[in-house]
Amino acid sequence: FGDVEKAIDGCEYVYHFAGQADIGFSSKSPVESIKNNILGTLNLLELARKYEVERFLFASTIYVYSELGSFYRVSKQSCEKIIEEYQKEFGLNYTILRYGSLYGPRANDFNAMKHFLTQAIKEKKITRNGNGEELREYIHVKDASSLSITALKKQYRNQHLFITGNQQIRVKDLLKMISEIFDNKIEIHFDSNRDTHHYEITPFNFKPQIAKKIIPETFYDLGQGILDLIYDLDAKINNVNNSEILNSK
């Protein structure tokens, strides 16, 4: 806590990206997930208030629109309401960043895109829960980070922003794209046991305060973003140079 306080002292803006973000873990460990996400956020809010931070930017999720997402969604909904109340009571300005399906370098192991590509590289096959009809709007982390900086503009103060991709794709088509990148040498299997913690077509059924969607003027093409991530993951998994991967298929 002391190191965090030292880091915040003198800051104009605080981005709060820390937290437990694995939906699967949260469904099995609700106490740990809620303590981590809610109490961690409260600690940062108190420090932001103490040092009169100009604005508190919070990484939330599109799952706040949903009844899915297990205790991960519950913790993010709770944090949003707490942040809003801090603004009412103490004048601490905020911006809520509701992220969609992120992908890119340095992703956690539970990240869907990383999971797909790791399976493809290691096993030459991809197994997916569901039938592949699920719709997603993947956004590259570089685009998301750019929009997170854009969120500092005055018009986004005390606003809720919806940050997701502008290329909608079905999961089955995404997996086909990945297979084609590997010269169709990847087997694709769908498990009929649907993951009940994730949405299929849309997360919109909860009805929170409506968010504004912001999109970059230029953005990563999904195919190019996937190819770049394959190079990155293969280098880490097989300890090879990026130029070797597709030539060694």
Write out the residue ranges for each language-model feature.
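Structural element of the ATP-grasp superfamily
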Residues: 44, 83, 116, 208-212
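PG/GG-rich flexible active-site loop of Rossmann-like NAD(P)H-dependent oxidoreductases
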Residues: 63, 101, 168
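Short-chain dehydrogenase/reductase
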Residues: 26, 100-101, 160-163
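A short acidic, often aromatic-flanked loop/helix-cap motif at beta-alpha or helix-coil junctions
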Residues: 2-3, 104, 194-198
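N-terminal Rossmann-like NAD(P)+-binding domain of SDR-like oxidoreductases, especially those catalyzing
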Residues: 1-98
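NAD(P)-dependent short-chain dehydrogenase/reductase
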Residues: 71-73, 77, 81-136, 141-150, ...
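Residues in well-ordered alpha-helical elements
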Residues: 2-5, 24, 31, 42, ...
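C-terminal substrate-binding subdomain of Rossmann-fold SDR/epimerase-dehydratase oxidoreductases
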Residues: 124-249
